[in-house]
Amino acid sequence: MKARFDKIYKDIVDTIAEKGIWSEGNVRTKYADGTAAHYKSYIGYQFRLDNSDDEAHLITSRFAPSKAPIRELYWIWILQSNNVDVLNELGCKFWDEWKMQDGTIGKAYGYQIAQETFGQKSQLHYVINELKKNPNSRRIMTEIWIPNELSEMALTPCVHLTQWSVIGNKLYLEVRQRSCDVALGLVANVFQYSVLHKLVALECGLEPAEIIWNIHNMHIYDRHYDKLIEQVNRETFEPAKIKINNFKSIFDFKPDDIEIIDYKYGEKVSYEVAI
Protein backbone atom coordinates (compact mmCIF):
# COMPACT_ATOMS: atom_id res chain seq x y z
CA MET A 1 0.00 0.00 0.00
CA LYS A 2 1.34 3.43 -0.96
CA ALA A 3 1.04 6.46 1.33
CA ARG A 4 -2.36 8.14 0.87
CA PHE A 5 -1.02 11.66 0.94
CA ASP A 6 1.49 10.97 -1.86
CA LYS A 7 -1.35 10.51 -4.36
CA ILE A 8 -3.23 13.57 -3.11
CA TYR A 9 -0.03 15.61 -3.25
CA LYS A 10 0.77 14.53 -6.81
CA ASP A 11 -2.80 15.33 -7.89
CA ILE A 12 -2.39 18.85 -6.48
CA VAL A 13 0.92 19.43 -8.27
CA ASP A 14 -0.46 18.00 -11.52
CA THR A 15 -3.53 20.25 -11.28
CA ILE A 16 -1.38 23.36 -10.92
CA ALA A 17 0.94 22.22 -13.72
CA GLU A 18 -1.95 21.55 -16.12
CA LYS A 19 -4.45 24.27 -15.18
CA GLY A 20 -2.57 26.88 -13.18
CA ILE A 21 -1.72 30.43 -14.26
CA TRP A 22 1.56 32.26 -13.67
CA SER A 23 1.54 35.48 -11.65
CA GLU A 24 2.28 38.76 -13.41
CA GLY A 25 3.24 42.25 -12.28
CA ASN A 26 4.20 43.03 -8.70
CA VAL A 27 4.06 40.27 -6.08
CA ARG A 28 4.48 40.57 -2.31
CA THR A 29 6.69 37.51 -1.88
CA LYS A 30 10.46 37.67 -2.34
CA TYR A 31 13.41 35.33 -1.95
CA ALA A 32 16.25 36.05 0.48
CA ASP A 33 18.27 37.69 -2.33
CA GLY A 34 15.46 40.20 -2.94
CA THR A 35 14.22 38.67 -6.21
CA ALA A 36 10.45 38.64 -6.66
CA ALA A 37 9.02 35.18 -6.00
CA HIS A 38 6.52 34.57 -8.80
CA TYR A 39 4.29 31.52 -8.76
CA LYS A 40 1.88 29.38 -10.75
CA SER A 41 -1.45 29.13 -8.96
CA TYR A 42 -4.80 27.37 -9.15
CA ILE A 43 -7.90 28.70 -7.38
CA GLY A 44 -10.31 26.50 -5.44
CA TYR A 45 -9.37 22.93 -4.47
CA GLN A 46 -10.62 20.36 -1.99
CA PHE A 47 -9.29 16.97 -0.94
CA ARG A 48 -10.37 14.43 1.65
CA LEU A 49 -7.87 12.48 3.73
CA ASP A 50 -8.73 9.34 5.70
CA ASN A 51 -7.16 9.79 9.15
CA SER A 52 -8.84 6.83 10.83
CA ASP A 53 -5.82 4.56 11.28
CA ASP A 54 -2.15 4.82 12.27
CA GLU A 55 -0.82 6.00 8.91
CA ALA A 56 1.47 9.03 9.25
CA HIS A 57 0.56 11.57 6.59
CA LEU A 58 4.08 12.38 5.44
CA ILE A 59 4.98 12.40 1.75
CA THR A 60 7.53 9.77 0.74
CA SER A 61 8.73 11.22 -2.59
CA ARG A 62 11.21 13.23 -0.50
CA PHE A 63 12.09 13.53 3.16
CA ALA A 64 9.44 15.53 5.01
CA PRO A 65 10.44 16.72 8.49
CA SER A 66 8.08 15.66 11.27
CA LYS A 67 9.66 17.08 14.43
CA ALA A 68 9.65 20.79 13.52
CA PRO A 69 6.00 20.79 12.35
CA ILE A 70 4.90 19.12 15.59
CA ARG A 71 6.86 21.65 17.63
CA GLU A 72 5.11 24.46 15.76
CA LEU A 73 1.74 22.76 16.34
CA TYR A 74 2.54 22.54 20.07
CA TRP A 75 3.59 26.21 20.13
CA ILE A 76 0.39 27.42 18.45
CA TRP A 77 -2.29 25.12 19.86
CA ILE A 78 -1.05 23.93 23.26
CA LEU A 79 1.27 26.71 24.46
CA GLN A 80 -0.89 29.20 22.51
CA SER A 81 2.18 31.39 22.11
CA ASN A 82 3.26 34.02 19.61
CA ASN A 83 6.79 34.34 21.03
CA VAL A 84 9.39 33.28 18.45
CA ASP A 85 12.06 32.74 21.12
CA VAL A 86 9.83 30.12 22.74
CA LEU A 87 9.53 28.35 19.39
CA ASN A 88 13.31 28.54 18.90
CA GLU A 89 13.82 26.93 22.31
CA LEU A 90 11.69 24.05 21.07
CA GLY A 91 14.09 23.60 18.15
CA CYS A 92 11.94 25.10 15.38
CA LYS A 93 13.06 28.02 13.19
CA PHE A 94 9.93 28.34 11.03
CA TRP A 95 9.10 31.90 12.12
CA ASP A 96 12.55 33.49 12.33
CA GLU A 97 12.06 35.51 9.11
CA TRP A 98 8.88 37.10 10.50
CA LYS A 99 10.05 37.86 14.04
CA MET A 100 9.06 41.40 15.07
CA GLN A 101 11.05 43.76 17.30
CA ASP A 102 9.19 42.59 20.40
CA GLY A 103 10.20 38.98 19.70
CA THR A 104 6.73 37.87 18.63
CA ILE A 105 4.75 37.41 15.42
CA GLY A 106 2.19 39.91 16.69
CA LYS A 107 -1.47 39.02 17.14
CA ALA A 108 -1.20 35.91 14.96
CA TYR A 109 -1.70 32.16 15.34
CA GLY A 110 -1.21 31.19 19.00
CA TYR A 111 -2.28 34.63 20.18
CA GLN A 112 -5.67 34.11 18.54
CA ILE A 113 -6.07 30.49 19.66
CA ALA A 114 -5.55 31.74 23.24
CA GLN A 115 -8.54 34.10 23.11
CA GLU A 116 -11.45 33.35 25.43
CA THR A 117 -14.36 31.88 23.47
CA PHE A 118 -17.95 31.60 24.72
CA GLY A 119 -16.75 31.54 28.33
CA GLN A 120 -14.03 28.96 27.67
CA LYS A 121 -10.36 29.75 28.34
CA SER A 122 -9.32 29.52 24.67
CA GLN A 123 -10.58 28.51 21.26
CA LEU A 124 -9.17 25.01 21.80
CA HIS A 125 -10.88 24.74 25.18
CA TYR A 126 -14.13 25.74 23.47
CA VAL A 127 -13.74 23.01 20.82
CA ILE A 128 -13.01 20.34 23.43
CA ASN A 129 -15.87 21.41 25.69
CA GLU A 130 -18.40 21.43 22.84
CA LEU A 131 -17.28 18.07 21.44
CA LYS A 132 -17.71 16.52 24.88
CA LYS A 133 -20.95 18.22 25.92
CA ASN A 134 -22.67 19.18 22.68
CA PRO A 135 -21.30 16.89 19.94
CA ASN A 136 -24.26 17.49 17.61
CA SER A 137 -23.44 21.18 17.36
CA ARG A 138 -22.63 22.58 13.92
CA ARG A 139 -20.90 25.57 15.52
CA ILE A 140 -17.68 23.94 16.70
CA MET A 141 -15.09 26.08 14.97
CA THR A 142 -11.88 28.02 15.43
CA GLU A 143 -10.96 31.13 13.43
CA ILE A 144 -7.75 33.15 13.51
CA TRP A 145 -8.48 35.52 10.60
CA ILE A 146 -9.53 38.52 12.67
CA PRO A 147 -10.01 41.50 10.31
CA ASN A 148 -9.44 44.32 12.80
CA GLU A 149 -6.17 42.76 14.00
CA LEU A 150 -4.61 41.68 10.68
CA SER A 151 -2.45 44.81 10.58
CA GLU A 152 -0.91 43.76 13.92
CA MET A 153 0.21 40.35 12.63
CA ALA A 154 3.71 39.70 11.29
CA LEU A 155 2.07 37.52 8.64
CA THR A 156 -1.61 36.95 8.06
CA PRO A 157 -2.57 33.31 8.68
CA CYS A 158 -2.53 30.82 5.82
CA VAL A 159 -4.47 28.01 7.49
CA HIS A 160 -7.04 30.01 9.40
CA LEU A 161 -10.24 28.06 10.09
CA THR A 162 -11.15 24.66 11.49
CA GLN A 163 -14.59 23.12 11.91
CA TRP A 164 -15.26 19.94 13.86
CA SER A 165 -18.22 17.58 13.48
CA VAL A 166 -19.25 14.33 15.15
CA ILE A 167 -21.32 11.70 13.37
CA GLY A 168 -21.72 8.27 14.96
CA ASN A 169 -18.82 8.77 17.38
CA LYS A 170 -16.53 9.66 14.46
CA LEU A 171 -14.76 13.01 14.44
CA TYR A 172 -14.49 14.93 11.18
CA LEU A 173 -12.21 17.92 10.76
CA GLU A 174 -12.59 20.54 8.04
CA VAL A 175 -9.69 22.90 7.40
CA ARG A 176 -9.74 26.13 5.38
CA GLN A 177 -6.50 27.51 3.93
CA ARG A 178 -6.48 30.85 2.10
CA SER A 179 -2.99 30.47 0.61
CA CYS A 180 -0.93 27.34 0.10
CA ASP A 181 2.78 27.04 -0.71
CA VAL A 182 2.63 23.51 -2.10
CA ALA A 183 6.34 22.65 -2.00
CA LEU A 184 6.83 23.54 1.67
CA GLY A 185 3.81 24.73 3.64
CA LEU A 186 1.26 22.12 2.58
CA VAL A 187 3.54 19.22 3.50
CA ALA A 188 3.98 20.49 7.06
CA ASN A 189 0.39 21.69 7.51
CA VAL A 190 -1.31 18.44 6.54
CA PHE A 191 0.89 16.45 8.91
CA GLN A 192 0.27 18.95 11.72
CA TYR A 193 -3.49 18.94 11.40
CA SER A 194 -3.65 15.17 11.06
CA VAL A 195 -1.92 14.99 14.46
CA LEU A 196 -4.17 17.68 15.97
CA HIS A 197 -7.19 15.73 14.70
CA LYS A 198 -5.97 12.57 16.44
CA LEU A 199 -5.18 14.44 19.67
CA VAL A 200 -8.63 16.05 19.84
CA ALA A 201 -10.27 12.69 19.10
CA LEU A 202 -8.30 11.05 21.92
CA GLU A 203 -9.21 13.85 24.33
CA CYS A 204 -12.90 13.51 23.53
CA GLY A 205 -13.15 9.72 23.33
CA LEU A 206 -13.97 9.83 19.61
CA GLU A 207 -12.64 8.03 16.54
CA PRO A 208 -10.81 10.21 14.00
CA ALA A 209 -12.46 9.96 10.59
CA GLU A 210 -11.78 12.19 7.57
CA ILE A 211 -10.05 15.53 7.20
CA ILE A 212 -11.68 17.72 4.55
CA TRP A 213 -9.15 20.28 3.31
CA ASN A 214 -10.18 23.39 1.36
CA ILE A 215 -7.60 25.61 -0.35
CA HIS A 216 -8.37 28.93 -2.02
CA ASN A 217 -5.05 29.76 -3.74
CA MET A 218 -2.60 26.88 -4.08
CA HIS A 219 0.65 27.71 -5.80
CA ILE A 220 4.13 26.59 -6.75
CA TYR A 221 6.90 29.21 -6.71
CA ASP A 222 9.08 29.62 -9.80
CA ARG A 223 12.26 28.42 -8.06
CA HIS A 224 10.40 25.34 -6.79
CA TYR A 225 8.59 24.42 -9.98
CA ASP A 226 10.94 22.13 -11.93
CA LYS A 227 12.21 20.36 -8.82
CA LEU A 228 8.69 19.73 -7.55
CA ILE A 229 7.47 18.34 -10.88
CA GLU A 230 10.43 15.95 -10.83
CA GLN A 231 9.84 15.05 -7.19
CA VAL A 232 6.20 13.99 -7.51
CA ASN A 233 7.03 11.70 -10.43
CA ARG A 234 9.49 9.68 -8.38
CA GLU A 235 8.91 6.31 -6.80
CA THR A 236 6.91 6.48 -3.57
CA PHE A 237 6.95 4.12 -0.61
CA GLU A 238 4.86 2.38 1.99
CA PRO A 239 3.55 4.88 4.55
CA ALA A 240 5.14 5.39 7.92
CA LYS A 241 3.15 4.74 11.08
CA ILE A 242 2.40 7.25 13.80
CA LYS A 243 2.12 6.50 17.50
CA ILE A 244 1.05 8.93 20.23
CA ASN A 245 2.73 7.91 23.48
CA ASN A 246 1.88 8.74 27.09
CA PHE A 247 -1.44 10.41 26.27
CA LYS A 248 -3.25 11.77 29.32
CA SER A 249 -4.77 15.01 28.07
CA ILE A 250 -4.31 17.17 25.00
CA PHE A 251 -3.28 19.98 27.33
CA ASP A 252 -0.43 17.80 28.70
CA PHE A 253 0.77 16.83 25.22
CA LYS A 254 4.47 17.30 24.41
CA PRO A 255 6.12 17.12 20.96
CA ASP A 256 8.23 14.12 21.99
CA ASP A 257 5.02 12.12 22.54
CA ILE A 258 4.83 11.66 18.76
CA GLU A 259 6.69 8.64 17.40
CA ILE A 260 7.12 8.04 13.67
CA ILE A 261 7.84 4.42 12.75
CA ASP A 262 9.44 3.05 9.55
CA TYR A 263 9.50 6.25 7.53
CA LYS A 264 10.91 5.53 4.06
CA TYR A 265 11.44 8.35 1.59
CA GLY A 266 13.22 9.42 -1.59
CA GLU A 267 16.18 11.72 -2.05
CA LYS A 268 16.02 14.95 -0.08
CA VAL A 269 15.05 18.15 -1.93
CA SER A 270 15.74 21.68 -0.70
CA TYR A 271 13.36 24.54 -1.49
CA GLU A 272 13.99 28.23 -0.87
CA VAL A 273 11.53 30.00 1.38
CA ALA A 274 9.58 32.81 -0.26
CA ILE A 275 9.09 35.52 2.35
From Swiss-Prot:
GO terms for molecular function: thymidylate synthase activity. SUPFAM superfamilies: Thymidylate synthase/dCMP hydroxymethylase (SSF55831). Pathway: Pyrimidine metabolism; dTTP biosynthesis. It catalyses: dUMP + (6R)-5,10-methylene-5,6,7,8-tetrahydrofolate = 7,8-dihydrofolate + dTMP. Gene3D superfamilies: Thymidylate synthase/dCMP hydroxymethylase domain (3.30.572.10). It is an enzyme of class 2 (transferase). Its main location: cytoplasm. Keywords: Cytoplasm, Methyltransferase, Nucleotide biosynthesis, Transferase. The keyword Cytoplasm applies. Homodimer. This is Thymidylate synthase. It comes from Fusobacterium nucleatum subsp. nucleatum (strain ATCC 25586 / DSM 15643 / BCRC 10681 / CIP 101130 / JCM 8532 / KCTC 2640 / LMG 13131 / VPI 4355).
